[in-house]
Amino acid sequence: MPISPAALAQLPVRRLGPADLLACADLSENRGWLREEHKWELLLTAGTGYGIDDPEGEGLLACSVVTSYGPGLAAIGMVLVAERYARRGVGRRLMRYVLEETGETPLTLYATANGQPLYEGLGFTEIARAEMVKGRFSFSAPAPDVTVRPATAEDLQDVLRLDREIFGLDRTPLITRLPAFADHLRVAVDGGVITGFAAAWPNMDTHVIGPLIARDTATAQALVASLAEASDRPLRTDIELRHTALLGWLKENGLNTIITNAVMVRSIPDLPGDADRRFAPLTVAAG
């Protein structure tokens, strides 16, 4: 017998941790998403997960993850509700709980067309749109002549400084995990100065490129090309529509649009940092 609306509204929300990884991946699969266990492990370790257990004992009924960057910003991602409980107000209730937990902290998230009305009703506004593109990199359009090399441990402090400048906030807990999380990590260098960096991390049968931080489009293109040379998988990344030259170049090189999402914020007029040099997020779930 289906659980009543009153009983559903009383189910407790609890914190999720690394031990809930498989349950989160199962919920992703239930909604037609990829399991993405590698990404889930990062998010549940570096962020704070919230979930509602299914009273029928079938794992999680709903979940979400918050990645905090201090009092200046937190990102909400992976908001999922099991198919059997869809359209019953569970997603809105979980989001309201997360909003209470985050208090006055400004928030950001990427929203699908289906999810955007829910978030607008909770006070989020759209500030940009981003295309997810995916495909085998063809090397049809050449990359600019920019020096790119594998990152080393000695680069870490310079990478953190550049990321803090461009992202606008300190995300050391995430960036310091990149060497272990990513299969490939590259830096662009000009005159001994690091001018950009990018990672390619494994996600099912693809390599996701992110973060992609660079002083200009040419540097971003060179970083992507270097990662593509190192990869034996299709590539996937999320690029804001403002970066028309980079998007056009990626499409010339065989990556096609999969979906367009809204970049949204709450309690802040825009994201901190420099959007012109912030080309791709580490993952849309972490902003």
PLM regions and their residue ranges:
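Conserved catalytic-core motifs of GNAT/GCN5-like acyltransferases
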Residues: 104-110, 125-139, 257-269
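Surface-exposed beta-loop interaction hotspot
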Residues: 127-157, 161-163
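Active-site-proximal cofactor/substrate-binding loop regions of enzyme domains
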Residues: 10-104, 111
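A structural microfeature
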Residues: 61-62, 128, 196, 259
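Intrinsically disordered, low-complexity, positively biased terminal segments
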Residues: 1-7, 17-18, 22, 42, ...
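Hydrophobic, ordered structural segments
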Residues: 86, 108-110, 116, 120
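Conserved active-site tyrosine of GNAT-family acetyltransferases
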Residues: 119-124, 250
